[in-house]
Amino acid sequence: MSGGARKAAFVLPTIITVAVIALIGTAVLQYRQDRSDRIAEAEKIGAAFFSDVATFEAEVQRELSEVRSGEPADLKKVVDAKLEDPPVLASAPDGAEASKTYRAAVKAEPMVLDPYTSLSDKLGRAVEAKAFVKAADDVLDHGPIVLLGYGTVFDSGPLRKRVLPELNRSLAEFRAVDVPKGAHDVAVKVDGALTYVIGQVDTMADHADDGKSYEFSYNTQYNAARQAVRDYATEVDGDVAEALDRIRGAKPT
């Protein structure tokens, strides 16, 4: 092989090698650029999610503050309406896990609505509790003394014709009221207090028919029932207040 041919033989592989290295280098650079673009896109998606969350939180708090009545039912309507259109984390390109902001958004998304769903639940309980507490208060506010007045009873007529029918009607109405979760023991106390009074009034009527004296007190039963109702109402109100405080301090993680 001549000198020129040998030189060409060595130069050609070198040129090919250089070309291959150049192509590989270009591919690596392109991959890095594509990866950088995907991460940047994921950052934008994550940031947009947190921005939507902040807007959602601000809107809920603003709309709740505009509810003049302060009634649990009205507050619940606001929360439930907002929960129908919650912030949603958009899908991201491959490699999004390399984005710190997107990873944080993925972690936060499952818990973002927790304070609001909890508030909705607490408000729903408060709505039920309000009707129950009112029914219990009405029953306990219309005892025998309210219906009959103070004094000595000599005739069973008013007891049988007015007091007992009214007490039995009140008991039936109370028993027809839905008992919210967590209020069963309260309902038992109220029911028991009224049942006790009905039994005592019936016994008093029998004694009046026989010309015998009879007296009874129902303060212990009624006071215990009233306290149970107050404690239950306080607990429900406290749960709502706590849930409201939680959303006021809610921050995406």
What are these regions (language model features)?
Residues 1-17:
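N-terminal export and membrane-targeting signals
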Residues 46-67, 98-253:
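C-terminal amphipathic alpha-helix
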Residues 27-34, 55-62, 66-82, 86:
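Extended alpha-helical scaffolds
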Residues 15-20, 35, 39, 180, ...:
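Generic alpha-helix initiation/capping and coil-helix boundary signal
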Residues 72-114:
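Intracellular, membrane-proximal regulatory regions of polytopic membrane proteins
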Residues 5-8, 20-47:
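Transmembrane signal-anchor/signal-peptide helices with a preference for the extracytoplasmic
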Residues 2-3, 24, 69, 94, ...:
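Feature targets compositionally biased, intrinsically disordered low-complexity regions
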